Amino acid sequence: MTEPNPNKQTVELNRTSLYWGLLLIFVLAILFSNYIFN
């Protein structure tokens, strides 16, 4: 599978990883706040 622009693929992969990281932090923050306030 050859990509015409591998640099663009890398950028999209990094953006996806960033979104997953933010989502993970968001979920952990919700769980942590529920653990504290309960």
From Swiss-Prot:
GO terms for biological process: photosynthesis. It is found in: Plastid, Chloroplast thylakoid membrane. Its main location: plastid. It is a single-pass membrane protein. GO terms for cellular component: chloroplast thylakoid membrane; photosystem II reaction center. The keyword Ubl conjugation does not apply. Keywords: Chloroplast, Membrane, Photosynthesis, Photosystem II, Plastid, Reaction center, Thylakoid, Transmembrane, Transmembrane helix. The chain crosses the membrane at residues 17-37. The keyword Plastid applies. One of the components of the core complex of photosystem II (PSII). PSII is a light-driven water:plastoquinone oxidoreductase that uses light energy to abstract electrons from H(2)O, generating O(2) and a proton gradient subsequently used for ATP formation. It consists of a core antenna complex that captures photons, and an electron transfer chain that converts photonic excitation into a charge separation. This subunit is found at the monomer-monomer interface and is required for correct PSII assembly and/or dimerization. PSII is composed of 1 copy each of membrane proteins PsbA, PsbB, PsbC, PsbD, PsbE, PsbF, PsbH, PsbI, PsbJ, PsbK, PsbL, PsbM, PsbT, PsbX, PsbY, PsbZ, Psb30/Ycf12, at least 3 peripheral proteins of the oxygen-evolving complex and a large number of cofactors. It forms dimeric complexes. Belongs to the PsbL family. This is Photosystem II reaction center protein L. The lineage of its organism: Eukaryota, Viridiplantae, Streptophyta, Chlorokybophyceae, Chlorokybales.
